[in-house]
UniProtKB/Swiss-Prot annotation:
Disulfide bonds: none annotated. Belongs to the DapB family. InterPro entries: DapB_C (IPR022663), DapB_N (IPR000846), DapB_N_CS (IPR022664), DHDPR_bac (IPR023940), NAD(P)-bd_dom_sf (IPR036291). Its main location: cytoplasm. The active site is at 134 (proton donor/acceptor), 138 (proton donor). HAMAP family: DapB (MF_00102). The gene is dapB. Gene3D superfamilies: Dihydrodipicolinate Reductase, domain 2, NAD(P)-binding Rossmann-like Domain. This is 4-hydroxy-tetrahydrodipicolinate reductase. It comes from Rickettsia africae (strain ESF-5).
Length: 239
């Protein structure tokens, strides 16, 4: 039985994971950590977990990694809003532990990323723009998924990513990300390839948080016997 530690257990994603975990017979939630805990509680939290699923805040990541290294606890990181220094911490930890990071753990969003990469190879001379829509209370903008998609495309086309074009004209070598916030939208991501004569749009819409939570649990199960490295959901789905 795989003992999973759930960081961010009282958040929306944490709640959904707790609702879905019984669907999986080979794992259980053995430890929980949330905003009511002291950071030093991460010590026992990591000690009692084989793999941690983290949907908390960037502020605790360094402490979480330190205790995970102490107890050789594997990490599945789904927290968004991470900055460059956080990714450096993940890369360093992955030299010792198996670490999986993804801004979006649903199979649909990762398939969208794969399709965008393939379309980019064919539509090399098309302009590319990304529009992401989320609920009114989402803190980070643009979404981590939108950044992931943009980075995937930009790496293939040699483009710069812009989040706020303002009043300036679109430059030839850029991919833009625009954000909408409102209602109770779980997440919509649209990638438009705009040519002179036609537009091709790829779209993924999450109808609820179930696909994210199922993906996170599958990631924890998959990671349990992997060697030290930094993984993504695309390693699981082999795309």
């Amino acid at each position: 039985m795989l003992n999973i530690g759930l960081s961010g257990s009282t958040g929306k994603m944490g709640g959904t994971i707790l609702e879905r975990i019984d669907k999986f017979k080979d794992c259980k939630i053995a430890a929980k950590f949330n905003s009511t805990n002291n950071l030093d509680d991460l010590d026992n939290f990591c000690k009692n977990s084989d793999v941690i699923i983290d949907f908390s805040t960037p502020e605790i990541l360094e402490k979480l990694i330190n205790y995970a290294l102490k107890h050789n606890t594997k990490l599945v990181i789904g927290t968004t809003g991470l900055q460059p220094q956080h990714f450096k911490l993940l890369e360093k930890a992955a030299q010792t532990l198996p670490v999986l990071y993804s801004a979006n753990m649903s199979i649909g969003a990762n398939l969208l990323s794969y399709l965008a990469k393939e379309v980019t190879k064919i539509l090399d001379d098309y302009d590319v723009e990304i529009l992401e829509t989320h609920h009114r209370n989402k803190k980070d903008s643009p979404s981590g998924t939108a950044v992931m998609l943009a980075e995937t495309i930009a790496s293939k086309k040699g483009l710069n990513i812009t989040f706020n074009r303002g009043n300036r004209l679109r430059s030839e070598k850029e991919i833009g990300i625009s954000s909408l916030r409102g209602g109770n939208v779980h997440g919509i991501h649209e990638i438009s390839f705009l040519g002179d004569d036609e537009i091709i749009t790829l779209k993924h819409e999450a109808l609820n948080k179930n696909s994210f939570s199922i993906g996170a649990i599958k990631a924890a199960i998959w990671l349990q016997d992997k060697p030290s490295a930094l993984y993504s959901m695309q390693d699981i789905y082999k795309i």
